[in-house]
Amino acid sequence: VKDVFKKQQIPYTSYFTTPTPLNNWLWYVVAATDSGYHIGYRSLFDKERKIDFHFIHRNDSLLKPVTDHADLQKLLRFSKGYYTVQQQNDTLVFNDIRFGQMIGWKDAGAPFVFYYYLQHPSQNDFVIQRGRFARWDMDALRVLVRRIRGE
């Protein structure tokens, strides 16, 4: 993966890789920068040593209104620095990106599996990977299998 970062001129301060659901052939790759993350997927069967990355901003500035929020401090520690923040209607959503995206190999804009509502904590009754298999259907499974094959 480091060779791919170098070849594709992807800057990073840290990175991690983890397998996607149900297999060990397609890997979720995240390269952190000071302002966000380059995210991509790499199959062991890819013919080219290339990863199609997309960039997601961390959006730290959105946290200013809730910096003293006790849950936020716990989430920052828990995420080990791998998070994004986004505004959804009237609330801020904290995404721990280490757990991946719901069918991210099919849709680069897919939601993250672990997310937490910062301004509506009562909606966080069950937050651990609440969306791991959300949005899965036969098409998502077909795309996963094709992507594993290196297509």
Regions found by a protein language model. Give the residues of each.
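Alpha-helical transmembrane signal-anchor/signal-peptide segments
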Residues: 1-13
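Extracytosolic and intramembrane catalytic regions of membrane-associated proteins
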Residues: 13-14, 21-151
